[in-house]
Amino acid sequence: SRKAVQALNLFGAEHCVGDRAEQDYTGKVLVLSPDTLKESCWSQENQLWYAHDGFGCSPHTIGRSVRCTCLGDGEMTRWNRNEFIGVLDDKFLPEWAKPKLAELQAQEQTDAPTMGGMNMK
């Protein structure tokens, strides 16, 4: 229900930037659709995910899976590209999410050079 979503100040399409169909999600903060979450899990903390990689990051591949980390609790998992509303506009990034985001971005930079072979599972 729209009202419940608004009451919880959940993120929606109005907080996202760019054309979803054309965006590469790699390294972006993504907004998970509330429809994907159980209602008991509805919160901004559970909606913001940092996208690492996965075929689903690219808009024109057949694969849909995006490997990402939750900015709320640090859980890493895979979601499908279509389960995200889009890329969060930086200006809506909450204060609580900034340290986690900075940490994940720093990790990406340290990890990058050592990833010689693509380790596809």
Regions found by a protein language model. Name each.
Residues S1, T26, W96-K98, G117-N119:
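Generic N-terminal leader/processing signal
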Residues S1-A4, T26-G27, S33, G63-M76, ...:
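Extracellular, surface-exposed passenger/stalk and repeat segments of large secreted bacterial proteins
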Residues S1-K38:
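Mixed-charge, Lys/Arg-rich low-complexity intrinsically disordered regions
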Residues L8, Y50, A112-T114:
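Composition-driven detection of intrinsically disordered, low-complexity segments
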Residues C16, E22, V31, S58-H60, ...:
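Intrinsically disordered, low-complexity, compositionally biased regions/tails
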Residues P34-R81:
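Basic/aromatic-rich interaction segments and small domains that mediate binding to polyanionic partners
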Residues T69-Q109:
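Intrinsically disordered, low-complexity, charged/polar segments
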Residues A106-K121:
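Non-Sec secretion/translocation targeting segments of pathogen effectors
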